[in-house]
Structure formats: C-alpha cells, structure tokens
Design a protein with these regions (language model features):
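Carboxylate- and glycine-rich phosphate/diphosphate-binding segment that chelates Mg2+/Mn2+
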Residues: 1-80
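A ubiquitous short alpha-helical element
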Residues: 7-8, 30-37, 109-111, 134-135, ...
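Hydrophobic faces of stable alpha-helices that mediate helix-helix packing
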Residues: 16, 20, 40-43, 47, ...
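Amphipathic alpha-helical interaction segments
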Residues: 37-41, 45, 65-68, 87-90, ...
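Hydrophobic alpha-helical packing residues
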Residues: 46, 50, 73, 126, ...
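C-terminal catalytic subdomain
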Residues: 80-150
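C-terminal charged capping/lid subdomain of soluble metabolic enzymes
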Residues: 123, 133-222
C-alpha cells in the first residue's frame, strides 16, 4: 500500500515533522489539558515506532501507530500552534525549496537547545514521561531529551547540515521567520531577528561528529 512503499527518507522526515508538531505544541504558552495529552501520546508513539517504520516499511503496526501519532500531533498544534522551528523551516522551504520535514528534523534539536532554561521544565517533563530520562534535574533531563532527538536523526541518516543556505540571505530569512512567529506563535521565549539569524548559521555548521558520520555513511537516505 501507499504507506509501505514510502521511501525511507520520506518516512524519517515526515515522522520527525509530526514530532516537531507535538513538541512545539506542548512547550508553547497556549496549551490546554487536551492538547498536552495529545502531544504526549504522539511523542511516545513516535519514539516507539518511527525508527521501526524506517527500518521496515512493511511493519503495519508501526505504520498504523505513526498515522495515529501524526493525527494527534495535528490536533495539538492546530489549537496550540507551533514555534520557531516551523518559522525558520518555512523560510528555508520558501527560499531554497528545502523539504519541510527535513528542515524541521534538523532544526528541532537546535532550536530546543537554544530556548535554554525557558523550555527546560517542559522538556524535562516530556523526557521523564517518555522514559528518556529519570534525572530530577530539569536541565539534565531536557538535555537528554534533545540528545535523543539528535540520535533519532542520526539513526535515520537525516542529512546535516542543510545545504545551500547563503550568508547574504540570512538577514532576510530571519525577518521572514520573525514576522511569521511574532506575535502569532506562543513560543517559550521571544526572539528577535538577530537571535533567529543564529539558527540559520547553526544549520550550516558541520561538527567533527557530523564529519566523521558523513565519512562513514556517505550516502543520504533514499
């Protein structure tokens, strides 16, 4: 069927897109009991099923659970909105044609880390609920949650960095993201264009770890 025949790369990026919907809906400042519950269930389902669906597209249980996760994440962000991950990703898609799910995948751990203490409490709560961390320290649990997202990206060969971003475009892109997000998105911390510019530079960078990974796995996801 259509789900089983999805390429691995599309399975990965659309799944991480759904994860972004759920997390941004949860950590924002305009949540309800219902949207928080939907986000939590979606995140747990994605953590438990996405990599299985990526490895074996014919696993009907994993595919079915990912469909439910995507639906739940959609109901959550429709009411509670998204955040700066989406604002930056939209500008990259509009300017360079970077696929939305791919942009979200790469940006998600970067933006979550950049929120700093403003997001620690809620990310730590998600880390504990989903079993990612048992640390009583919010900063530690939040960091472990973010690292888990990074490890998911790596395990599914989501390419980093995002190619083709030109330095001369970044101020304009940051203004686009700022206009989209402010004041519509109830983000954990308000940023201006200068802070947003940093996000574009961060997705351009290649760490030593990434260079080693790319040399070991030169091929991108199908």
């Amino acid at each position: 069927d259509m789900m089983s025949s999805m390429p691995k790369g599309l399975t990965a990026s659309t799944g991480m897109d759904a994860l972004t919907h759920a997390i941004e809906a949860y950590i924002g400042r305009s949540t309800t009991k219902q949207t928080r519950a939907a986000s939590i269930e979606a995140i747990q389902l994605i953590f438990d099923n996405l990599q299985t669906a990526y490895k074996n597209g014919n696993d009907k249980t994993a595919r079915r659970n990912m469909l439910r996760a995507s639906y739940l994440a959609g109901t959550a962000f429709t009411k509670s909105y998204v955040g700066y991950v989406h604002a930056v990703a939209h500008s990259l898609g509009g300017c360079y044609g970077i696929p939305h799910g791919l942009a979200n995948s790469v940006l998600l751990p970067i933006v979550l880390k950049a929120y700093g203490t403003a997001a620690h409490k809620k990310l730590a709560r998600l880390a504990r609920i989903t079993g990612i961390s048992d640390s009583k320290l919010d900063a530690v649990a939040a960091e472990e949650f973010i690292n888990h997202i990074r490890s998911m990206n790596i395990s599914m060969n989501i390419p980093e960095p995002l190619d083709g971003i030109r330095n001369e475009d970044i101020p304009k892109l940051a203004c686009y993201a700022d206009k989209e997000a402010n004041p519509l998105y109830p983000v954990p911390a308000l940023w201006g264009p200068e802070k947003l510019e940093q996000m574009y530079h961060l997705v351009q960078e290649v760490s030593e770890h990434d260079r080693n990974r790319n040399s070991e796995h030169p091929g991108k996801a199908a």
